[in-house]
């Protein structure tokens, strides 16, 4: 029955979304067409608003009778004929999806999100789906297809538009162009300009005007002041107009959309704040009638707020942590509107919905490309946080550089700026390539660089930037306290750090193409370096003895395998529990996951009180400095065996 219901909803959505935005393709995810573009460029380099070509008519969404009515007393009824003169628009906005396409033990995918959006839209008068940037880069399946699998999904869903974010540039402009060609919706960014022509770049539009049952909604898209966050070599041919220049562009575009018949103006901005108030990223003058509602992104904060002029601003957390939803009631007789609902819908809500088949269909379509995500690399015996992983990568940078160039150059260090993404740690258990690609999605190649001594000290050896990780070899350690400020030294870093102008690095040579931090880490895991378990059982009594002789809050480097009976589960989300050996010895377990990283609460067959389990984890001695509580525990364990 569930499958029949899902098919009926999909059919209804195919009909209904034609009223607002592009027609979703529910039959063949590979059958897509290019977005409509406008060639009539203005003198300032911008282009006129494009009009969505979708048929606004549909059997379930008849065109509204919007002409010839008045409602001077604003009672939502025509003063003459008495019919209702209000309709509602429901906006569903995604920002910073970061390619989280397939559900994992740590993040939601679009399987349940698809069903949630379809069911919600089927019940709405005028549903509109839009995206506010950073949609592609981050998840393994999206990264391996360079965003195409996400764009294909957005085609299927009938998105009205997608604003470009800074991470859309991580692979270079050519891949933005590839996605623009595939998309049935326009990529928006009113303020991205070509450095050589001083005109708006060809692969995105300023706005789109969509028709909804006789009414028209304009959507303006812009990227925020985040140019410096992009690797310099990826944006060397473009620049962003920000500040007062961006305000002027948006005002002019709003006026053009109003002149073209727009009843409402939506601003989709890849920039945002923390939610306390609207910050400097947004010019409040735009709330003086130029925009009616703002959907934001980039900062990965969840908020719904109203600015001083009463305009709503919404953002969801990012990494598929949720979506923004706003319902706006519009009176087409007098042009007045009000936001009747504005909310952040968490992924915990839509993850419970039935999986939509489109995800499996698209994975099948791209199977020759995305298969690498499931490549098994080996076993990680204990959870490793992002800092530990980045320390290891810095050492791997150094080792790779010394092996390649060490005979010719005295290499001081390896490392540089390293950003780790969600979930921010590597789970214990079996590791696949996709696990690494999710944490380290960036395609920055290794380079040998020269650097002046003073910059070596300030930018690397003694930097205060906590995102810089370095490893010095024996030579580097021998000279690090005696650096000549005017001397020339050599380091191994990656192209993100080498292209960052303030580092003042000179590239000498580049390592093999398409070898990135995650690839070095993958080979390291394949060599068995993360499998530190002996596989032998250690008694609970011995675990308690070993832990009692450890310093406060210390953790072993090795993982230990323990068997015992569960006598208590005191946290049903993470699986915190107490084990007994039947001889009076009790052991605390802080966290249990499956071998594939699935968290305790998401396991299909959870260990319960009375079960016998074999777990593997490092030993940790946890001492609370405030209370003096002293606990010996297995820290973030992996379930090896379960006996009911």
What is each PLM-predicted segment?
Residues 27-64, 70:
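Intrinsically disordered, low-complexity serine/threonine-rich repeat tracts
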Residues 85-351:
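Acidic, metal/ion-coordinating pockets
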Residues 2-10:
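Sec-dependent signal peptide recognition
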Residues 21-23:
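Bacterial signal peptide processing site
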Residues 76:
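Acidic, glycine-anchored loop motifs typical of Ca2+
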Residues 88, 100, 122, 238, ...:
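Catalytic centers of hydrolytic enzymes
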Residues 535-644:
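OB-fold single-stranded nucleic acid-binding module
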Residues 16-19:
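C-terminal motif of bacterial Sec signal peptides marking the signal peptidase cleavage site
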């Amino acid at each position: 029955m569930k499958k029949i219901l899902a098919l009926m909803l999909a059919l209804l959505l195919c009909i209904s979304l034609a009223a607002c935005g592009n027609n979703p393709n529910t039959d063949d995810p590979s059958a897509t067409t290019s977005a409509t573009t406008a060639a009539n460029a203005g003198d300032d380099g911008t282009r006129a608003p494009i009009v969505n070509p979708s048929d606004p008519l549909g059997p379930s969404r008849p065109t509204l009778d919007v002409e010839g009515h008045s409602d001077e007393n604003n009672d939502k009824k025509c003063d003459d004929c008495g019919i209702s003169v209000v309709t509602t628009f429901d906006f569903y906005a995604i920002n910073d999806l970061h390619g989280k396409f397939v559900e994992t033990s740590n993040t939601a995918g679009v399987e349940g999100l698809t069903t949630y959006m379809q069911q919600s839209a089927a019940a709405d008068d005028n549903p509109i789906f839009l995206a506010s940037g950073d949609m592609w880069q981050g998840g393994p399946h999206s990264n391996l297809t360079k965003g195409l699998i996400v764009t294909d999904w957005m085609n299927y869903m009938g998105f009205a538009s997608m604003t470009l974010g800074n991470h859309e540039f991580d692979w270079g402009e050519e891949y933005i162009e590839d996605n623009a060609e595939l998309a049935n919706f326009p990529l928006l960014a009113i303020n991205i300009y070509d450095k050589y022509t001083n005109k708006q770049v060809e692969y995105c539009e300023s706005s789109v005007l969509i028709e909804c049952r006789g009414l028209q909604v304009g959507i303006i898209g812009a990227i925020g002041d985040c140019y410096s966050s992009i690797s310099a070599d990826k944006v060397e041919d473009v620049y962003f107009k920000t500040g007062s220049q961006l305000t002027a562009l948006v005002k002019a575009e709003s006026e053009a959309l109003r002149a073209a018949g727009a009843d409402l103006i939506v601003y989709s901005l890849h920039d945002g704040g923390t939610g306390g108030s609207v910050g400097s990223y947004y010019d409040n003058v735009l709330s003086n009638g130029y925009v009616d509602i703002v959907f934001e992104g980039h900062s990965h904060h969840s908020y719904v707020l109203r600015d001083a002029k009463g305009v709503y601003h919404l953002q969801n957390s990012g990494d598929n942590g949720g979506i923004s939803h706003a319902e706006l009631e519009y009176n087409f007789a007098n042009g007045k509107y009000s936001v009747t609902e504005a909310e952040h819908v968490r992924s915990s809500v839509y993850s419970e919905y039935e999986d939509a088949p489109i995800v499996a269909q698209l994975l099948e379509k791209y199977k020759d490309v995305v298969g690498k995500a499931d490549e098994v690399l080996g076993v990680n015996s204990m959870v490793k946080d992002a800092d530990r992983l980045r320390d290891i990568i810095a050492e791997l940078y150094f080792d790779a550089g010394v092996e390649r160039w060490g005979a010719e150059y005295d290499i001081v260090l390896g490392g540089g700026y390293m950003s780790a993404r969600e979930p921010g740690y590597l789970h214990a258990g079996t590791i696949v390539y996709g696990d690494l690609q999710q944490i380290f999605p960036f395609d920055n190649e290794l380079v040998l660089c020269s650097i002046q001594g003073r910059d070596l000290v300030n930018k690397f050896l003694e930097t205060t930037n906590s995102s810089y990780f370095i490893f010095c070899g024996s030579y580097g350690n021998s000279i690090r306290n005696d650096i000549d400020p005017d001397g020339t030294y050599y380091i191994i870093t990656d192209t993100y750090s080498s292209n960052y102008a303030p580092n003042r690095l000179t590239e000498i040579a580049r390592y093999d193409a398409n070898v990135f931090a995650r690839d070095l880490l993958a080979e390291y895991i394949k060599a068995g370096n993360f499998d530190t378990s002996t596989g032998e059982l250690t008694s609970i009594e011995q675990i308690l003895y070993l832990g009692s002789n450890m310093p406060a809050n210390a953790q072993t480097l090795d993982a230990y395998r323990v068997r015992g009976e569960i006598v208590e589960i005191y946290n049903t989300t993470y699986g915190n529990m107490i084990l007994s050996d039947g001889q009076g010895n009790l052991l605390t377990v802080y966290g249990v996951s499956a071998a594939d990283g699935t968290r305790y609460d998401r396991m299909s067959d959870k260990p319960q009180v009375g079960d016998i389990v074999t777990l593997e984890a490092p030993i940790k001695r946890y001492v609370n400095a405030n209370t003096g509580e002293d606990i010996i525990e297995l820290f973030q364990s992996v379930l090896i065996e379960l006996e009911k």
